[in-house]
Amino acid sequence: MSLVEIHAISKSYGAVQVLKDVSLEVAKGEIIAVIGRSGSGKSTLLRCVNGLEPIQAGSISVDGVKVNDPKTDLRKLRQQVGIVFQSFNLFPHLSVSDNITLAPRVVKKQAPGEAREIARDVLRRVGLEEKLDAFPSQLSGGQQQRVAIARSLAMQPKLMLFDEVTSALDPELTGEVLKVLESVAQDGMTMILVTHEMGFARRFGSRVVFMHEGRIHEEGQAAALLAEPKTPELKTFLSAVLH
């Protein structure tokens, strides 16, 4: 059974339909790179998988749990589904340690000492162990994004969703964050990433999904799809982002 099963989902904001009959399955350990123009439905798709946005038709399951079932405890589900946005969303008045340990202590009832050790471990994974007691204002944008990733990893999720996590960063800081994503990928984490980083998608993506006007327009193995796009829409998109 796939870890993520998305079947024929549709999503509208008022009269505007942003997802149209979208279906996708993601196996455990797969890395899916979702690409496409702004407004194609990429970010909305991630938010639906996490249960942050309701759908009007179809179904979404994560590890056998139906996300769109009214009986589903979404807070419990989100312990298994981490999501990192392009805005870092760190609490400015809390230290890095407290930002990371807040959810494990409150949601998973971890002891403070245990939660702090997990925080230290995930910060080590993102190369920021020495920033354990720093505050967000003392960090660069790239460091803040790495802390945001560490915060999600601290919940030990089965699935990680990344929504254009490098788009607000300067090129040199983008490299820092991509190295962390590469490390998470190499650890075997199942990931769905909305990204414009085609090099990352080519090297680490199991598959690439190209969204266009609310639909999955083209899908395939990452290297092959990016090297030989079949549709004019994908060819045009790749020409724009690669040059």
Regions of interest found by a model, annotated:
Residues 2-222:
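ABC family nucleotide-binding domain
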